[in-house]
Each structure stands twice: as structure tokens, then as C-alpha cells.
Amino acid sequence: MFFYEKFDIIVIGAGHAGTEAASASSRMGQKTLLITQKRSTIGTLSCNPAIGGLGKSQLVKEIDALGGLMAKVIDYSGIQFRILNSKKGYAVRSTRAQADRFLYQKNMNYFLNNQKNLTIFEQEVSDIIIKNYQVQGIITSDGKIFKSSIVILTAGTFLNGKMYIGSDVFDGGRRNDVSASILANNLKKYFSKIGRLKTGTPPRLKKKSINFDILKKQYGDYPTPVFSFLGKIEQHPKQVPCYITYTNDHTHSIIKKNLHLSPLYSGSITGIGPRYCPSIEDKIIKFPDKISHQIFLEPEGINSEIIYPNGISTSLPKDIQVDLIQSISGLENAHIVHSGYAVEYDYFDPRDLKMTLESKKIKNLFMAGQINGTTGYEEAAAQGLIAGLNAALKIQCKDTWYPKRNEAYIGVLIDDLCSKGTSEPYRMFTSRAEYRLLLRENNADERLTTIGYKLGLIDDFRWKIFSKKQDSISRERNRLKNIILQPKTVFFSSNNKKTIYLKKKCTAFDLLRRPEISYNDLILFLNSFLKKKIVIKNKEITEEIETQSKYFGYIQRQEKEIKKYKYYENKKLYCIKDYREILGLSNEAIIKLNKYRPSSIGQALRISGITPVTISILLIFLKKRKKKKFYFKK
């Protein structure tokens, strides 16, 4: 072994968590090393070639609001953009983009290669140098030593990864990529709570072998939405349709007949798979009453000859995969280019992490991505960003930062993982966010860009554009609040073709709160009698003003709930070294509180098994200590 080079921060793994972690720390001025087994696989979309979706697009836009890469990259790589839940309220609308997986990798590499302070190195990591439970660097498989005071581990599905196709088992975390078994086994010296999770992917199909003529086309939205705050429609490559087909009784009978050959049901795989992205075997067993399951045939790229059949993940033997694929309408002559497979891998209990994603056991070791029990590119990228920025803050001897549950979906993700842990792959949904009316995808920049600028994640160019937008929103909102409409004013709504008579005096902003009145209707009405005509062409600005108005009452209610939430979050528990010293706590409470070491009363509340009685005892204990004028170190 020999010393090679020293860095401020080393990131192991260049998937979605690793790329965001390395980008964040280097943007904040830290000399960063991003090390990966293969440079050619940086930013690979290992499974579904898509970014965003319900609950996920909110994460992507929050990453973007903090200067991250994912939104920028997909804007240059997306070949079909759609708004999901477009007929519902803004709180649950989510953008999804089909990606050209080759363009996505190319564009991710472009941004990383042009990032200052960032070095990319190709080699497998065999061990993390840890002395006295503190990180000091890494060792590569060929004996190179890279020294660093902070290491961020983002190994994805590669720690002791095993791939399954029927009875065939291979070492690997992804097709054509070997697992990081040496590193995984070395980490077992320091971590006892290591579990196994499972994920899977469908077979890939040859495009020319599919009969698209009998299938339903699915087009993207027009005009196409964008992900990044700085994104433009002109950045999008050529847009293409997807296609829809369905499984049938024959498909289901093939699967049932051969279920014993699936490693999921033969006992070969013990890890739990993602609940909300089940294999086709799981779907048939768990939903026996369904006569068919929808499959989206998604192109893997503009010029790609490969189709991704979304919704039919499987690890059945290769010959059975051929039979089940060819039983489906439009796929009767389909040729499988790559067989579907399942992957089982190691993950760590995220409750052993601080909210910054630093290990509670190993000083200066941060962990992000699927190794923390999540599933999905977006969840991994969000964790990578938080780990990267907090690693940089630690180098700079500055206070740590992470968003709270009321500030971002990223905050919900981090809090759920670190407070509750997970026994199955964790996926983000809008339903997980109790303050989702405030955490809309269209106000991510308003919520997070200011702190991003203060942290050094956002450049001056973006800050100026953001500030200008916020000024425009503020001016227009105030203008509407200062326009007084008198009783008996007649207003026509184009939404429901009705004439509205005002019964009492109100402001134009208040009038906009009515569900049947759109911003465009209001402006047309106001311009008909105002001397100074107002025309705002920026759709983002008008949507935000309309949302603020229509959600006004609900937002006020949630802000009251947040005050209560903050009260508990501000009651810190750092002063308690051993919960056995507190009289009245149950044995279960003592064991769980000593085990998970919650940072606040709020976090303690979210630990399974912690009762209101326990919380009351803790609050009384803190109050007594405060009266005795104890100093609490935050």
C-alpha cells in the first residue's frame, strides 16, 4: 500500500447519491474526490429510465433549489415530460420525465467534469481507514491510500450485491458490474445492524420485435414542463411517445405455474422488496382478483433499439421470461435483449445516523442512498445532497443544516429514516408529508434557494434571477391586495360560465380565493376598468400567486400546526446522557431512547412505541433542569 493523494472529502460511489454529494461539497469549495468502479457508469439509470413522479418530483425540484444536478440533467435528457395529477390541486401535482438514459449519463458527466474542486478517479474501494472510530481515508483494491478527514459512502446496491435469475446467482449490484464484497465485509467490523433488501428490474426488449400498431400511444404534455428553475423547453431533446399494453389470464397462468422457480418464492432471496414497485410475481399473488396489469413500454432513448417494459419486473428463469413476455398483446414476437433479474444487497439501519446523515458510531463517516434503506434515484440524490453539504460545513467548522419536515420533502425523507428507520425499501409519496400544502413542487425555490445561497450552493447568477422572481410575486400579490372591489360588482367566470355578483366589499386577492375564478379571468376583469393595464406573462409567477390565494385558509391552518411542531423540535435532548436517570420512564422507553438517541422531543415522538406519557415525563424533566439553570449544549 502507498499514499496517493489527500482530499477534504472523499465520496465512494458515483450513482445518484454520490454525484449529488460530490457536486455539493465541491460547489462549497472543498477539494473533493469522487471514486467509482467504472467511470463509464457515472449517473447510470440502473432500472427505469425516468426521473420524477408522485412525491419524487418534489425531491428533484428541492435538489435543484439547492443547486443540485438532477433537474438540470433531466431537462437536457428528457424525451417525454408529463404533469401527473394535473387535474388536482398544486399540492399533489408532480412532474415526470422519461429519460434518454444515454443522454442522461452524458450530461451528468458533462456537469461533473466541469465542476471546480472535483476529481473523479476510477478504482474499487476495498476499505475505509478508521482509527479510534474516526475516518482517516480510504484504501483502493490496488493498494492506493487516499487520505481524507471525511468520507461519504454511497455504494447503492453494491455492498454484497447478489443478482438472481431463476436458480442462477451472480455477484453484482447491477448487470455487468461486480459487487463491493470486500468493502462490505470490512464494514461489518463497525456495524452490527446490517440488513438485506431486494430490488428488481424487468427484461429489456428489442424495439423492432414489438408490434406497436395495435398498442395505445401515450404522449407527453404540451407545452412540455421543465424541472430546473433555470430550465427551458428549448433544452429538451426530441420528444417521443410511450406505449401501453396489459398482462392477461394466459400471462398470469404462466407465472403461477412457474412460481416455484422464482427466487422470491423459492427461499433464495430473504430481503424485502419495494412495496410500491413489486415484481410481476408479487402482483399476481397479492392481487389475485385483478384480471390484468398495465405495462408501459418506454423507449430507453431517442436512437435506442431497446424498450423498457415498466410494470413487469421479474427474476423468473430466462425461458419463462420469454413465455410470459410473448403472452402479452403486441409482444407476441418480442425478443428479450437482457433478462430481468432481482438484486439483494446490504443496507444499514438509518437510525444509526444523525440528521446530517453522519454516522453516530464512526466520526466523519456520512452515508447516503440505497444503503440507508431507500429505493429510487430521487431519494438517493436528496440524501447525497444533504450528506455532501454537511460534510463541507463540518470541514468549514460551521453549524450543520438540514431541512425540517415543514420545510421540504427532503426533510420528511431524512426525518422518517433517522427517526423511524425502515424494514423495507422506502419510497417517497406526497402522503408522507403532513405539510404538503406548503411543500409544493412549484415553490421549492421559494422555500430553499435563500438558504442554498447562504450555504454557498447557489451562484450569483441564479440568485439574481430568483430574487427578481420573488420581487415580481410580492409586487403582484400586494397590488391585488390593494385593489378594493365594491359590493354588486359583476364578474364573469370562464371556468363555469357563470356570472358572479359580489355581496360584500373584498380585495382582488380575496376574490381570487374562490375556486371558480382563475388568475387570467381576474386580470381580464381588472384590466377592463383599471387605467393601468397589467400583463404578466411568466406562468410560474401567476400560478404561485393563484395558489397562495386559493390555499390561503389551509396554509394558515398548517402554519398553526407547524408552530406546535417547532415547539417539540426545539426541545433538545442532547443534555440527557442516559435515560435511566429519569424517573418514571418505562423499560421499553428507556431501551428505545438510549438506542436511537433522538435529538429532540419531536424526533422522540416519531419513534415507534414512544407514548404521550413518555413525552410528558421528558418535558417535565427538561423543565426541572431549566429551572436549575443547567446549560444545554446544542
Swiss-Prot record:
Keywords: Cytoplasm, FAD, Flavoprotein, NAD, tRNA processing
SUPFAM superfamilies reported for this sequence: FAD/NAD(P)-binding domain
Binding sites annotated in the UniProt record for NAD(+): 273-287
GO biological process terms on file: tRNA methylation; tRNA wobble uridine modification
InterPro entries named in the record: FAD/NAD-bd_sf, GIDA_C_N, MnmG, MnmG-rel, MnmG-rel_CS, MnmG_C, MnmG_C_subdom, MnmG_C_subdom_sf
Family stated for the protein in its record: Belongs to the MnmG family.
Record-linked HAMAP family: MnmG_GidA
Protein name: tRNA uridine 5-carboxymethylaminomethyl modification enzyme MnmG
